[in-house]
Amino acid sequence: TRLVGSEMCIRDSAEIADDVKIGPFCVVGEHVKLGPGCVLHSHVVVEGPSSFGSGNEFFPFSVLGLKSQDLKYKGEPTYLEVGDNNVFRENATINRATDIGGTTRIGNNNLFLVSCHAGHDCQIGNHVIFSGFATAAGHVTVGDYAILAGCCAVHQFVSIGEHSMVGAMARVSQDVLPYTIVEGHPAVTRSVNSIGMQRRGFSEEDLRAVRMCYKKLFVNKKLTVHEALEELRNSDYAENACLKRIVKFVETSERGFCH
């Protein structure tokens, strides 16, 4: 471990890979595991029990692994698991879980920008972007390649579908369908995330299938959700993977979805 500064606190139970770089005024708490290639710039706090994979980078005043901000939490053992190659910019905060034995999970290749927050028990996928001041309350699930724009706020237990985008300053209290864009206060579904899908290499058939889902669920006001799903299941794109994913997402949504 390369200790860049002498003014730091590293607890005896911390497990730190040999090539981790730790800057001045950092705190590495009890039962923290830091994998190879991690870099902690100055004034970083990581507490445990928590584990971090390889290649993670922590900028000044980022704080990860502290106890949940939940009044019912009474000190039970909970965890934070972080994958590889994530970036936590200044003042980003990630909390451990609330329920005994629970785990907050962050996947790989995610970017958490200035002053964003992921609360207790969040389940964050891969290649996700939390823009500045974006906040996710407890138990929020965020799918791969989703983008949360600046200053948005996501209600607890909401699911954000993969390849979706939440607009700046949106108030999200219901689920966000995969491949869609929501914005507003409260958030409503505005369109298909066509540009995002194109950038990720989705086919024209995928785009057409998702656009049809959007029209059935949001444009055609004469259809109930149940009727729209039936038409999608019997459409020419019924076997398309994106369509199947949207149908399943709607069927399993517990909070309803942004209209």
Label each PLM-derived region with a short phrase.
Residues 10-11, 111-113, 246:
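Conserved short hydrophobic patches within well-ordered secondary structure
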Residues 21-160, 168, 176, 180, ...:
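Flexible, glycine/small-residue-enriched loop-and-beta-strand segment within the central core
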Residues 171:
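A donor-sugar binding/catalytic signature common to diverse glycosyltransferases
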Residues 1-5, 9-10, 120:
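Single conserved hydrophobic/aromatic residue that forms the stacking wall/gate
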Residues 6-30:
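N-terminal segments that cap or nucleate solenoid repeat domains
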Residues 6-7, 18-19, 55, 61, ...:
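Terminal amphipathic alpha-helical/low-complexity segments used for targeting or macromolecular assembly
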